[in-house]
From Swiss-Prot:
A GO molecular function held by the record: ATP hydrolysis activity
UniProt cross-references to Gene3D superfamilies, sorted A to Z: P-loop containing nucleotide triphosphate hydrolases
Coiled coil: 284-387
Enzyme category, top tier: hydrolase
CDD domains found in the cross-reference section: GPN1
Organism in which the protein naturally occurs: Dictyostelium discoideum (Social amoeba)
Residues that hold GTP according to the record: G44, S45, G46, K47, T48, T49, N204, K205, I206, D207
Gene: gpn1
SMART domains: AAA
Job of this protein: Small GTPase required for proper nuclear import of RNA polymerase II (RNAPII). May act at an RNAP assembly step prior to nuclear import.
Protein name: GPN-loop GTPase 1
Enzyme Commission number(s) of this protein: 3.6.5.-
Length: 396
């Protein structure tokens, strides 16, 4: 008997433990969200080629991903996106219809696409439970996306729904010059400051030029100053000052060297993406929840204020007599009657005019004259009868 009880107790504990594990697994499945990656970079930095390499890496490792192309002006893509802006907006037709140049055509195409981006978001959300990554390929003209209203709308919509990371692609061979390097870093800083999202700086084309010099400049202020020793111009002095200002900014960045050609650094790239996603949950999501709470509290406070005002009005009017202004009501009724009279007269006038135009009015008058004559004849007969009666009375 005791053995049976012990076995039952053990079985119960095991079952409870399994239920807890199953619940935890279910919670993890419900909480799982794909990481949204927005790829940015100057024209010629290799964004699209890098995205092709990322797509190949995901396919090779059987990692589910979802790619959205937001460049309406690209003629040919080296990969097949899941959603393509070109299927919705005809870039050349937009330029022709609105008489726009290349950049204006891209901005207008993005604006048109962003008006329906909530539908895109619905499609992505339906598949999100089976995805690990969502990747957005942006136009080559970086300012068209980062500084436009449509780019901001798309970024904020995605960031409010999924953990979002910005990837700023840098052309490494062109960054060996300290001034060019500083220009890239300033642009990355401005994007990060505007969006408040975590960022990964991807130094592309490391198969041509190694990126270690750039990481050293970011981590060691003195090494960057040494690189500027032979530049006595005002630009060199400005770059020195800016490097001191950006030193703290570098500490918030994740950086990695990659090659879109041979695939070097792709594994490390995804590691950095994971670290940046943690920063999203730690900072951006907390700020987002704070903003939502502030908005909700403000709306609740406004509702409470209106409710209190309504209660005060009800209390003040409680037991009060309602006075009816009969004079005002009578005046209103008289105005309505006067209006109706004028309306009737106007209708009669219109009817008379219509009858006169159609010839009916004349015949109507003739009928009236004949009616008057018959009445006069009857009157004369009555008069003669009365006179005859009076004569008879006098004779009597």
């Amino acid at each position: 008997m005791s053995e049976t009880t012990a076995t039952s107790t053990t079985t119960t504990k095991t079952t409870d433990k399994d239920n807890v594990n199953n619940n935890n697994n279910n919670e993890n499945k419900e909480e799982k969200q794909p990481i949204n990656i927005i790829v940015l970079g100057m024209a010629g930095s290799g964004k699209t080629t890098l995205l092709q390499r990322i797509r190949a890496h995901l396919y090779e490792n059987k990692i589910p991903g979802y790619i959205i192309n937001l460049d309406p002006a690209v003629s040919k893509l080296p990969y097949t996106p899941n959603i393509d802006i070109r299927d919705t907006v005809n870039y050349k037709e937009v330029m022709k219809q609105f008489n726009l140049g290349p950049n204006g055509g891209i901005v207008t195409s993005l604006n048109l696409f962003s008006t329906k981006f909530d539908k895109v978001l619905e499609i992505v959300e339906k598949r999100s439970s089976s995805l690990d990554y969502i990747i957005l390929d942006t136009p080559g003209q970086i300012e068209v996306f980062t500084w436009s209203a449509s780019g901001t709308i798309i970024t904020e919509l995605m960031a409010s729904s999924f953990p979002t990371v910005l990837v700023y692609v840098v052309d490494t061979p062109r960054t060996v010059d300290p001034t060019t390097f500083m220009s890239n870093m300033l642009y990355a800083c401005s994007i990060m400051y505007k969006s408040k999202l975590p960022m990964v700086v991807a130094f592309n084309k490391i198969d041509i030029t190694n990126h270690r010099f750039a990481e050293e400049w970011m981590s060691d202020f003195d090494s960057f100053q040494d690189a500027l020793t032979n530049d006595p111009t005002y630009m060199g002095n400005l770059t020195r000052s800016l490097s001191l200002v950006l030193e703290e900014f570098y500490s918030t960045l994740q950086s990695v060297g990659v090659s879109a050609v041979d695939g070097s650094g792709i594994d490390e790239f995804f590691e950095k993406i994971g670290l940046a996603a943690q920063d999203y949950h730690k900072y951006y999501k907390a700020d987002l929840e704070k903003i939502k709470k502030q908005k909700s509290d403000k709306e609740q406070a406004e509702a409470n204020k209106n409710w209190e005002k309504l209660k005060r009005d009800l209390e003040e009017s409680k037991g009060a007599k309602v006075e009816y202004d009969f004079k005002k009501e009578k005046k209103r009724e008289n105005q309505e009657k006067t209006k109706n009279i004028y309306d009737d007269e106007e209708d009669d006038y219109r009817d008379d005019r219509d009858m006169e135009d159609s010839g009916e009015y004349e015949s109507y008058e003739d009928e009236q004259e004949e009616g008057d004559y018959e009445n006069e004849e009857e009157r004369l007969e009555d008069q003669r009868a009365y006179e005859s009666l009076m004569s008879s009375i006098k004779k009597i």
